[in-house]
From Swiss-Prot:
This is Arginase-1. The gene is ARG1. Pfam families: Arginase. InterPro entries: Arginase, Ureohydrolase, Ureohydrolase_dom_sf, Ureohydrolase_Mn_BS. Mn(2+) 1 binds at residues 101, 124, 128, 232. Keywords: Arginine metabolism, Cytoplasm, Hydrolase, Manganese, Metal-binding, Phosphoprotein, Urea cycle. Its cofactor is Mn(2+). It comes from Bos taurus (Bovine).
Length: 322
């Protein structure tokens, strides 16, 4: 496959306060060190690097009920939303390098300011749809979708730090792929709101080809619209991405991860991308960190056109040498 070069705006979001484990704030650094931006440029993408955001460490951040670090997390997403919106106004695809998945509140909010008709494909072992009232852990990286859904607006308490958030997607605008660790309250929300999901059971039953076909038919069947892919590396099996905060056995294979992203690229509709929850501190060995980072880079590259069948430039490779 070859097509016109894509323009990308890369935003590093070194933030960890949506969950308890240190190290996830190093995600952008290790992905940059692995040469991600250079590889995108080799693909002839037009890459603009917006650098890494800096996040204030709000010392006076007492919990809201059991919700931890609400002001820090809310402020970080607010800052990210502004930068993503800025990137989208230039017509670039926003590429957010996390950081923990609470940042999706900001990434999707900012994207929706410019493209309110967007749809979301959420690849993850978890639904991240607990509300501040259903959460058992209080970690905000397990709650971003609840802040984004219009249908949950009335069920959400006023959490300090989140006054700026306006729900921007409906239940019918999101599809989950890779689920295998869903809390009872989350399962209730999925079922009550009729949210479309493909847990690992459906992936096993249907195969990833059918899963993507059904995903596109569901989200794009009536009208082509911008896609926001929010990719938590724990959606993949921990044999491929061990260095992450909440790994769950029995996940998507390397091949399934590539298939998902290759197919999204082929639609030509990818408009925003989050690459979340790479935590180099949680690799048991340096090799586990390298494996996680290399897998994550490969998944990201597939979003921008690297295909397993190969790629070529639009020239005649068989023309006789001059």
């Amino acid at each position: 496959m070859s097509s016109k070069p894509q323009s990308i705006g890369v935003i590093g979001a070194p933030f960890s306060k949506g969950q308890p484990r240190g190290g996830v704030e190093e995600g952008p650094t290790v992905l940059r060190k692995a040469g991600l931006l250079e590889k995108l440029k080799e693909l002839e993408c037009d890459v603009k690097d917006y650098g890494d955001l800096s996040f204030a460490d709000n010392l006076d951040d007492s919990p809201f009920q059991i919700v931890k670090n609400p002001r820090c997390v809310g402020k970080a997403s607010e800052k990210l939303a502004d930068v993503v919106a800025e990137v989208k106004k230039t017509g670039r695809i926003s590429l957010v390098l996390g950081g923990d998945h609470s940042l999706a509140i900001g990434s999707i909010s900012g994207h929706a300011r410019v493209h309110p008709d967007l749809c979301v494909i959420w690849v993850d072992a978890h639904t991240d749809i607990n509300t501040p009232l259903t959460t058992k852990t209080g970690n905000l990286h397990g709650q971003p979708v609840s802040f984004l859904l219009k249908e949950l607006k009335e069920k959400m308490p006023e959490v300090p730090g989140f006054y700026w958030v306006a729900p921007c997607i409906s239940a019918k605008d999101i599809v989950y792929i890779g689920l295998r660790d869903v809390d009872p309250g989350e399962h209730y929300i999925l079922k009550t709101l009729g949210i479309k999901y493909f847990s690992m059971t459906e992936v096993d039953k249907l195969g990833i080809g059918k899963v993507m076909e059904e995903t596109f038919s569901y989200l794009l069947g009536r009208k082509k619209r911008p896609i926001h892919l929010s990719f938590d590396v724990d959606g993949l099996d921990p044999s491929f991405t061990p260095a992450t905060g909440t790994p769950v056995q029995g996940g998507l294979t390397y091949r399934e991860g590539l298939y998902i992203t290759e197919e999204i690229y082929k639609t030509g509709l990818l408009s925003g991308l989050d690459i979340m929850e790479v935590n180099p501190s949680l690799g048991k060995t340096p090799e586990e960190v390298t494996r996680t980072v290399n897998t994550t880079v490969a998944i990201t590259m597939a979003c921008f056109g690297v295909a397993r069948e190969g790629n070529h430039k639009p020239i005649d490779y068989l023309s006789p040498p001059k």
